[in-house]
Amino acid sequence: MSKNSGLPSFASTEADNSQGFVLSVSGPVVIANQLAGAAMYELVRVGHNQLVGEIIRLEEDTATIQVYEETSGLTVGDPVLRTHKPLTVELGPGIMNNIFDGIQRPLNAIAEITKGIYIPRGINTPSLNRTIKWPYQPDTKLKVGDNVSGGDIFGQVVENNLIIHKIMVPPKEMGTIVEIAPAGEYTLDHALLTIEFDGKRKQLTMVHNWPVRSARPVIEKLPCNYPLLTGQRVLDSLFPCVQGGTCAIPGAFGCGKTVISQSLSKFSNSDAIVYVGCGERGNEMAEVLMEFPELHTKVGDKEEPIMQRTCLVANTSNMPVAAREASIYTGITLAEYFRDMGLNVAMMADSTSRWAEALREISGRLAEMPADSGYPAYLGARLASFYERAGRVSCIGHPTRIGSVTIVGAVSPPGGDFADPVTAATLGIVQVFWGLDKKLAQRKHFPSINWLISFSKYMQALDTHYDQMDPEFVPLRTRAKEILQMEEDLSEIVQLVGQDSLGESEKITIEVARIIRDDFLQQNGFSPYDKCCPFFKTVWMLKNMMTFYNLAQKAVESSTADNKVTWNQIKNELKEIIHRITSMKFQDPTDGEQTLTAHFSTLNEDIITAFRNFSDLV
């Protein structure tokens, strides 16, 4: 009898006669025999503690199993129970505002059961709370005798003020409605809809299961055309992502990957967030758990905690290595489920490097042929199959709806080396690359995104959208990028011969580039006025900086040889204007769009007037 005998276990609920026996144990990899008829990726329970495992290789009646829990204490001859199903997640009300481990065990519920801070081995508790009664409202258009198929919405549950949970027919089910439950409060296991197909009746509840390694079906993938607004000026203006896009954030330790991931979770224009902490420090998840409940978003006149639209999957670095792979798949399956309701979901994976390291460790124990840096040869294929589950799609079922999953994957290359196999493979897959720079981070320039190596392939897809919002934005962005590139080209000359040897036009370029770097690209994520920058503020800041640059260049170019205008003259005469331009970031968005627009518009007019007066003086 195991020492956790008082806890719910698998054997007490789903034990099966099909059983094999452990042959060998090597860390998280267990080899068992007498498992003829088992399937690849079938879930098994290993040992007397019934540890969760997954079959990853089959040879005759011998199976190689990766175990998602600590394997110390397993011995040769221990039983291995088959479950006849793959690793699945439970999908239904109660996912949001919850924290799971890599195989969707609810950490809050386990803490209440065990009254401790550790997860006992082999514990088998339902992922979603079966005792809560949810207010269910059936779809009034459906009636007995109607035909339904996978993806059809037959009711809804108001999970909280941010998420209205649509209850759907599971993707592989279909039939004729025999019975419909009336509106009321029900638990997850209560039958809400009874359907009949081919003479067999099936009762549908609020919850259904889905295998994590299979993508949920869709009608078709659609082109992405709406930006994912992050609240970070450098990302929204220079390297935008779309809802349904794929992004990578590679960077060395201390560059701010986690802060960017967390600010995306806090301030992006997504309807739901799935945050997967995959192999990172436990303190980072603790930080999220402490900060998120205090953050609020406005819904109508009320403030609501953003934790209500967030689901956390925590698989920290001290948890079993094999479960890191499962946590990524668990996260993306949860995200696809909310996408099928017609929501725009953002999934943060922090970090995919730790997942790749788990693949490398298990691959090594399986004695597979190593490729670059010891990673398995199928690393690129695994990464691609994960990122390909992102996208904007037309969902199956009725009524027709469009949803999206955006994947933002943080990558931690050792020593910040972007030639690392994981970073190189990720770069070939993703459409947006936000490269973090150690030197910028050391200069305390945050977010430390290097504007010279980062890129976004969604620029053209979003140009139509930007033209509708503000026709001036695209030319402004192009001009700002040119100035930053020119500054980089001039920096070598400045280092060799000094800034005084440059022409006046180049001096203006260098100074305006410095203003863009320090007062536009740099952003204090911990200040109330700058933690989130709305898009209108970003555009106005860029507009005023470019207006100043264009007028300064014009003043220098139009001056005559005997009355040459210099940068020093402009700087001395327009000191107050330059100070106001550099102080634009201090305008607080909570004052409202009208107030800020009026302020920036006045500044724009003042810049034009100041240069007009300056040219009259000269």
UniProtKB/Swiss-Prot annotation:
How is the quaternary structure described?
A: V-ATPase is a heteromultimeric enzyme composed of a peripheral catalytic V1 complex (main components: subunits A, B, C, D, E, and F) attached to an integral membrane V0 proton pore complex (main component: the proteolipid protein).
| EC number(s) per entry | 7.1.2.2
Gene Ontology CC terms: contractile vacuole; endocytic vesicle; pathogen-containing vacuole; phagocytic vesicle; proton-transporting V-type ATPase, V1 domain
Question: What GO MF terms are annotated?
Answer: ATP binding; ATP hydrolysis activity; protein-containing complex binding; proton-transporting ATPase activity, rotational mechanism
Concerning HAMAP family, the annotation shows: ATP_synth_A_arch
Amino acids binding ATP: 251-258
User: Source organism lineage?
Assistant: Eukaryota, Amoebozoa, Evosea, Eumycetozoa, Dictyostelia
Look up the coiled coil feature and give its residue ranges. none
Q: Which UniProt keywords apply?
A: ATP-binding, Hydrogen ion transport, Ion transport, Nucleotide-binding, Translocase, Transport
- Entries under SUPFAM superfamilies matching the protein: C-terminal domain of alpha and beta subunits of F1 ATP synthase, N-terminal domain of alpha and beta subunits of F1 ATP synthase, P-loop containing nucleoside triphosphate hydrolases
As for family, the record states: Belongs to the ATPase alpha/beta chains family.
This chain's protein is named V-type proton ATPase catalytic subunit A
What biological-process GO terms show up in the record? ATP metabolic process; proton transmembrane transport; response to bacterium
Keyword Nucleotidyltransferase listed: no
